[in-house]
Amino acid sequence: MAASLSELSTYLGERLIGRVNDADIAYGELTMHVEPRNLIEVVTFLRDDQRCQFISIIDVCGADYPSRPKRFDVVYHLLSPKQNVRIRLKVQADEETMVPSITGVFPGADWFERETYDLYGVLFSGHPDLRRLLTDYGFEGHPLRKDFPLTGFVEVRYDDEAKRVIYEPVELKQEFRNFDFLSPWEGTDYVLPGDEKAKTN
């Protein structure tokens, strides 16, 4: 498997000169880093080339690295059923950089790109319907960004008296507690405050 991935990496490096920044093989998967301006050309080649035949899009997802100038990785997972090989493409972007939509090449990427936009705020140029998919219409922010607060900004609940959904500021019912366990791998064999009331066998 590693030999075939290495051969594929060499082949793609020769065929996509200047369009792929670099490629590496890790954990049995080939990853190629691509600039946004080259994405459509690379994806089209991977789909149409007779040796590759990556005809199935598995997923499009995001990753957030706030310390980088281009904080987002948009990651494309493609499958070649004929070759029984997967490939991963990574494109870096920031809040303003628009990544070209690949829905013209893979129509199935439509909701994957909407999900990435909704959860990370990555913008896709040329997308036919770039709007939120998983969060509510009036939702503020993008919940999978590392700088998004754990509690969110508002609390949404259905009010039975008003017979509608209402939005309220987040109200924590108890103060934040930090549990200090000696070892998360061993479990606790000591009594924490309040546990002395519990029966132990």
From Swiss-Prot:
Broadest EC class assigned to this enzyme: translocase
Encoding gene per record: nuoC
Biological role: NDH-1 shuttles electrons from NADH, via FMN and iron-sulfur (Fe-S) centers, to quinones in the respiratory chain. The immediate electron acceptor for the enzyme in this species is believed to be ubiquinone. Couples the redox reaction to proton translocation (for every two electrons transferred, four hydrogen ions are translocated across the cytoplasmic membrane), and thus conserves the redox energy in a proton gradient.
Entries under PROSITE patterns matching the protein: COMPLEX1_30K
Source organism, top-level taxon: Bacteria
Topological type in the membrane: Peripheral membrane protein
Catalytic activities: a quinone + NADH + 5 H(+)(in) = a quinol + NAD(+) + 4 H(+)(out)
Gene3D superfamilies xref list: NADH:ubiquinone oxidoreductase, 30kDa subunit
Self-association state and partner proteins as the record states: NDH-1 is composed of 14 different subunits. Subunits NuoB, C, D, E, F, and G constitute the peripheral sector of the complex.
Locations listed in the record: Cell inner membrane
HAMAP family in alphabetical order: NDH1_NuoC (MF_01357)
Main subcellular location: membrane
Annotated signal peptide: none
Protein name: NADH-quinone oxidoreductase subunit C
